[in-house]
Amino acid sequence: CYSTITLDLRVNPIPSPAVPDPIEVCDEDNDGFTFFDIETYESDIINGELDITISYYETLTNAQNAVEPLVSPYFNIVPDSQIIFVRAENDLTGCFNIVEQELVTLPSPVLPVIIEDIILCDQDGDGVTVFDLTQRDDDILGDQTTVDFELTYHETLEDAETGDNPIINTSSYVNLSNPQTIYVRLEDLNNGCVSTGEFDLIVSLPPVIIQPTPLELCDDE
């Protein structure tokens, strides 16, 4: 004797996450390590699918088992270039797929630890004179060339960081105060990374001449 029943088989599709572009971050100290916002391309990875949860892992095994997810910002553990694994899981079916995400540190321009101040004498005592900022160009650039790097000078740190309002008359700049801090911006034209530094313009005032008191001596003769 036997009986029959109808059994419905349902095959749920797995998510189809998009492979993201590498996440590139400028490395301020050029040691190959920095913090990454690993969620940068999350919407691109989801690729318009509904009910998808994204999580990130250091190893493929962890991604497959959904253990030890990473938290953003993430500090890379492999210098210069590291692959992490992105798990895209359907909240309704539990089906998942995994794609790789590359993390890349970009080298930043190298500035001297200390940029030497420019000190000039002031002949008229008003604390103002003309400075040639370009005399620091070679010290700042070092082995870096103007073919690959752009050097600009700025009056504020904010302008140096954003690249706004560069000083135009760099070879004949008149100081605004004494001393005055000048901010340096060095940009890598290949990767867009920027380093900033500073040095002072100092006007050395002439000494104040004091009229001596007349010296009187008695003449015994």
Regions found by a protein language model. Name each.
Residues 1-221:
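Extracellular low-complexity Ser/Thr/Asn/Gly-rich intrinsically disordered segments
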